[in-house]
């Protein structure tokens, strides 16, 4: 039996292929609505799996085309991140037989596909070598994450990164090697090998500092049109992926343009800082609040996610400072959107966990440099 899957995000099509490749279905793919209509006429598939939000011809256009072409001979399954009931009703009225809301597990997608085509249900048992698919999820959004790396050869938690991209089919991790003098580049290339759809390596031959590494990574990732959001995360995973995913959920369900983690110590949270580091952080934060004119609790947490608009407009020019580029991002947003509007576009989300990892590159000496860089930012405003 033939299945045609249509989605403008290649990572979603790859996930569908992973879900169904161990079945007897003949799989075909289309990258947009126009191609889906053309392949539908060519292939006459038994099932079409279609996304609603595609450029040009939308999923609704595809539904209408199928409905008017073959009098219900082809089953149609909508797979979308849209959770509005009115959208779902509209899809069913347009001819959809099934509506799957993302995020959705690969095993659930496989079972629903087999059921709609009246095929034997093939559920992978816990003893199956491929049972790992049970925990793999097609995410609602496609998110690119820039991870700057400098001399991380011995610290990089490769297995943690592997497990994350295996379970979360909607993330692409871009590791930026910032001119490392050890074997970091080799470690990163080995990590990406065989996982090119989900992990890439961007190599900067010379060390330019964290700010420039993140900027180069963002500019590289923005070229990928499938990404709904782009963010960055420290390589030591002081902020873990669970908290980062919370940032993504926040921005995707709001009008915020950028959401950052906030290391606020509170009941129920595991926020661990060295005593001296905590004191300096508070001092720096007071200075930042005065510079920005905004009541931030924590601008310097290395976990943030943003819209494509912010990624495209706020990373064009190099940053003046190495450690305080987060502050410069907010200043650029303030200048671009205006002081009155910008505070409605920025969100701080408290983290559940943040741990100062051994071997962190930020030292007491660096903290003094940060204060000096704050003064540079202050003078550059005048």
Question: Residues of each region from the PLM?
Answer:
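A conserved acidic beta->alpha catalytic loop
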Residues: 177-186, 237
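Two-component/phosphorelay signaling modules centered on CheY-like receiver
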Residues: 10-28
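C-terminal output helix
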Residues: 86, 104-113
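Acidic catalytic/metal-coordinating carboxylates
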Residues: 32-35, 58-61
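Receiver (REC) domain active-site loop signature in two-component systems and cognate sites
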Residues: 54
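Acceptor/aglycone-binding surface of glycosyltransferases and processive sugar-polymer synthases
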Residues: 202-220, 229, 241-323, 357-365
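Alpha4 helix (beta4-alpha4-beta5 surface) of REC/receiver domains from two-component response regulators
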Residues: 61, 83-98
């Amino acid at each position: 039996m033939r299945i045609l899957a249509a989605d403008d995000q290649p990572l979603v099509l790859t996930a569908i292929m992973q879900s169904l490749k161990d079945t007897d279905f003949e799989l075909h793919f289309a990258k947009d609505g126009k191609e889906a209509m053309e392949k539908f006429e060519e292939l006459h598939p038994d099932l079409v799996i279609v996304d609603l939000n595609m450029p040009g011809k939308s999923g609704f256009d595809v539904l209408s085309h199928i409905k008017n072409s073959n009098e219900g001979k082809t089953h149609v399954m909508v797979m979308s991140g849209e959770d509005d009931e009115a959208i779902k009703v509209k899809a069913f009225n347009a001819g959809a037989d099934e509506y799957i809301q993302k995020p959705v597990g690969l095993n659930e997608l496989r079972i629903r596909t087999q059921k709609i085509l009246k095929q034997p249900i093939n559920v992978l048992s816990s003893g199956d070598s491929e049972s790992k698919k049970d925990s793999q999820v097609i995410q609602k959004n496609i998110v690119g994450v820039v991870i700057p790396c400098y001399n991380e050869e011995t610290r990089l938690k490769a297995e943690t990164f592997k497990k994350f991209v295996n379970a979360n089919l909607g993330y692409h991790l871009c590791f930026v090697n910032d001119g490392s003098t050890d074997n970091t580049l080799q470690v990163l290339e080995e990590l990406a090998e065989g996982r090119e759809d989900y992990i890439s390596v961007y190599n900067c031959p010379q060390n330019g500092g964290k700010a420039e590494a993140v900027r180069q990574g963002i500019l590289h990732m923005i070229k990928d049109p499938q990404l709904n959001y782009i963010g960055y995360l420290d390589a030591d995973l002081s902020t873990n992926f669970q908290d980062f995913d919370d940032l993504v959920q926040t921005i995707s369900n709001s009008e915020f343009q950028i959401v950052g983690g906030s290391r606020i110590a509170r009941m129920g949270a595991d926020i661990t800082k060295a005593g001296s580091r905590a004191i300096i952080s508070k001092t720096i934060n007071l200075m930042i609040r005065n510079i920005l004119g905004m009541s931030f609790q924590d601008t310097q947490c290395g976990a943030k996610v943003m819209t494509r608009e912010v990624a495209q407009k706020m990373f064009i020019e190099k940053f003046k400072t190495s450690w305080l580029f987060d502050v410069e991002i907010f200043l650029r947003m303030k200048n671009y959107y205006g002081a009155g509007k910008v505070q409605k576009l920025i969100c701080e989300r408290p983290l559940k966990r943040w741990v100062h990892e051994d071997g962190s590159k930020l030292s007491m000496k660096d903290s003094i440099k940060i204060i000096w860089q704050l003064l540079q930012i202050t003078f550059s405003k005048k």
